[in-house]
Regions:
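Conserved H-loop
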Residues: 79
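Active-site-adjacent loop and "lid" segments of alpha/beta metabolic enzymes
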Residues: 1-76, 90-175
């Protein structure tokens, strides 16, 4: 991550390991012994925007983890923290949809939420087909995410995502 920021011009760290490339994401919160994961120290030092993804399979576990991890990041000087519920990571199909259904509860943490649902297996496994046939499901879930407070969408199909944003903005009377 350091090399990407300092030498290759990256502007943001998108961490799919929940703070630790050494597997901390798979260790239950109560069993984690490292006070501050190395990645968190790096983010605090470099002062770059940071996407913190969760692999927790329940919203309660995710909220608990995010609360602890956000505090650790802030203790180290991190400012621009973005939360990613990590759809498709560490969760089965039912768990993904249970978290999606209650995703607005993440807004209590007062940080932007990123949703990367585009073409995910949770769509095409439910509907049948594959990633190439999941555009309608992606658009539906993008729209729901926006209505539940997501501020950032990670997408493959930009035109369709922009249309979803415009429709939700019109519904919510945003200019």
């Amino acid at each position: 991550a350091r090399k990407c920021i300092e030498e290759w011009g990256a502007d943001i760290i998108n961490d799919v390991s929940e703070g630790g490339i050494t597997g901390i994401a798979n260790v239950p919160l109560e069993q984690r012994h490292e006070e501050y994961p190395e990645m968190f120290r790096l983010v605090g030092e470099l002062k770059v925007p940071y996407i913190l993804m969760s692999v927790q399979p329940t919203l309660a576990g995710m909220m608990k983890g995010f609360a602890k991890e956000v505090q650790q990041l802030r203790d180290l000087g991190a400012k621009d923290i973005i939360l990613d519920p990590g759809f498709g990571f560490g969760k089965n199909l039912i768990q993904n949809y249970q978290i999606y259904n209650e995703m607005e509860k993440l807004n209590v943490l007062e940080l932007p939420v990123l949703v990367g649902i585009s073409r995910k297996s949770m769509i095409y496994k439910l509907l049948g087909g594959d990633a190439t046939t999941s555009l309608n499901g992606t658009s539906v879930l993008d729209t729901i995410a926006l209505m539940k407070g997501a501020k950032i969408l990670r997408v493959h199909d930009v035109k369709e995502a922009v249309e979803a944003v415009r429709i939700v903005d019109a519904m919510m009377d945003k200019d």
